[in-house]
């Protein structure tokens, strides 16, 4: 578990990610929420609805199950931050972590559930109006990115944001993070990537 790479380097981030994966895996195995091979487990999740850059989504009746990789997050803790932020900002579409595992390639995966919603697509203008109404400013229309000084919100397009039959706007998937200066979206927050683990 030694961190040998220089601080603030990409290699250090990767090392921290591996340490976090190892600790989460150990805990998840002890508590019964670990899946050795999510590729095999997928057969019991339901019909495959969609597959994106990081997730495979399965039909589970009134909910969907998502098996999500860390493609956009080197460290598991940052993905878990993303879930917490999503749940804080978009309560109607909360995600709940069910467990953790690895796929057949050995990649670390997080398994979540989310209520299934139906509705109609919104225009980009409607999404922009909604997002600005909840306090965000459009900073990059090419990748649907909005921000406040503290929060970065991206991927707000019409496959991830829609209006339900009840008229409510539902954000089912987005890239939401603490807005740091490195994201180049007016961010003022800082994050520490150092995590201290206490050995049992």
Report the location of each language-model feature.
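ATP-binding glycine-rich phosphate-binding loop
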Residues: 1-63
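ATP-binding glycine-rich loop module of kinase domains
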Residues: 42-91
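Protein kinase-like catalytic core scaffold
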Residues: 63, 110-112, 152, 170
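Active-site ExK catalytic segment of metal-dependent nucleases
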Residues: 64-71, 115-117, 173-175
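Catalytic activation segment of kinase domains across protein kinase-like and atypical kinase folds
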Residues: 70, 146-200
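Active-site-adjacent loop/helix micro-motif of nuclease/hydrolase catalytic cores
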Residues: 72-81, 122-127, 180-186
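Conserved structural core of kinase catalytic domains
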Residues: 87, 92-142
């Amino acid at each position: 578990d030694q961190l040998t790479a220089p601080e603030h380097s990409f290699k250090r981030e990767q090392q921290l990610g591996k340490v976090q994966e190892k600790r989460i895996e150990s805990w998840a195995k002890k508590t019964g929420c670990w899946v050795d091979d999510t590729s095999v487990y997928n057969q019991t999740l339901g019909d495959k609805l969609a597959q994106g850059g990081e997730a495979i989504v399965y039909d589970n009746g009134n909910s969907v199950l998502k098996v999500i990789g860390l493609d956009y997050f080197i460290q598991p803790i940052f993905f878990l931050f993303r879930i917490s932020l999503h749940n804080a900002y978009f309560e109607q579409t909360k995600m709940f972590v069910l467990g953790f595992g690895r796929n057949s390639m050995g990649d670390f995966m997080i398994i979540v559930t989310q209520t299934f919603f139906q509705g109609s697509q919104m225009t980009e203008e409607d999404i922009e109006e909604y997002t600005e109404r909840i306090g965000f400013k459009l900073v990059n229309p090419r990748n649907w990115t909005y921000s406040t000084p503290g929060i970065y919100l991206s991927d707000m397009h019409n496959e991830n944001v829609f209006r339900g039959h009840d008229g409510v706007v539902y954000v089912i998937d987005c890239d939401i993070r603490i807005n740091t200066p490195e994201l180049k979206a007016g961010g003022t927050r800082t994050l520490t990537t150092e995590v201290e683990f206490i050995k049992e």
